[in-house]
Regions:
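Surface-exposed coil loops of outer-membrane beta-barrel proteins
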Residues: 1-69, 81-86
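Exposed, low-structure sequence patches enriched in small/polar residues
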Residues: 41-47, 51, 57, 65-72, ...
């Protein structure tokens, strides 16, 4: 079992929503990664998260995730993120669903009084609900991310343009089961990526900073969502303390 914050990868919220990252903050399985000592922000990782065991009520579920990034000169970089979710059945509902998501991207991080990070990527989400049909659905789209920070003050904008990445969200998991795939837990990403208007924009404005070598983290801000049909807002206030660092426990880094 390991903490989600140990993941190095840059995963779009199409992979994991804020609520998924908060409530499902422990991963059960395997994590392995390599981080370059010669190039900053250069790494590759792979993890397996066993999310559910087969039983009378619960599904057998596991997720394979991987990410990598290579940083070039002057802040340019390229990388990828990948997820394969095996969403199998329970004794009461034997249908199996395959759900994949691939996100190659390129970006540029630089400083011009403010710290900037601009990234553009492609999202491809092949998936198949075997209880629905045996045809693969292959929605895709593009995402552009922009981040500006200074002294902890942060402006972040994520713009997605493309097809509905969660086409099974509102479909019932079985003929006699009044539960949709969205309710049953097939999608871990933000539900806004199920947009039917080919657009989703998320803007975050606020304060996000860590103190005492990462022991204390403070985050507060406003989030604005737009999916082509209307706008919604969220307020975020979060204070977190790393107990492991506070009491100097757990594995120590080798020097």
């Amino acid at each position: 079992i390991f903490d989600r914050k140990e993941l190095l990868g840059d995963y779009s919220r199409a992979f994991f929503s804020d609520s998924t990252a908060f409530y499902h903050n422990r991963l059960s399985g395997f994590l392995g990664h390599y981080k370059s000592t010669e190039r900053e922000n250069t790494y590759v990782e792979m993890a397996i998260d066993w999310e559910g065991m087969y039983s009378e009520q619960s599904r057998e579920m596991f997720r394979i995730i991987s990410a990598g990034r290579y940083t070039l000169e002057r802040g340019f970089y390229f990388g990828y993120a990948f997820s394969m979710f095996h969403f199998a059945g329970s004794k009461l509902n034997e249908n199996v669903t395959d759900n994949l998501l691939v996100n190659p991207y390129v970006g540029w991080g630089f400083n011009a009084y403010f710290d900037f990070d601009i990234k553009a990527g492609f999202l491809f989400a092949p998936q198949r609900g075997r209880s629905v049909d045996h045809n693969w659905k292959k929605p895709c789209g593009a995402q552009i991310d922009f981040v500006l920070t200074k002294w902890g003050v942060k402006l972040e904008n994520n713009l997605y343009l493309g097809e509905n990445l969660q086409p099974l969200r509102n479909i019932a998991v079985g003929e006699d089961i009044p539960v949709t795939y969205g309710q049953d837990g097939l999608y871990a990403g933000e539900p806004f990526y199920a947009t039917t208007k080919n657009v989703y924009n998320r803007t975050w404005v606020g304060y996000d900073r860590r103190f005492f070598k990462g022991t204390l983290a403070v985050e507060a801000g406003m989030v604005f969502h737009y999916d082509g049909t209307g706008m919604g807002t969220q307020q975020v206030v979060k204070l977190s303390v790393d107990i492991q660092k506070l009491f100097n426990i757990g594995p120590k880094a080798k020097k």
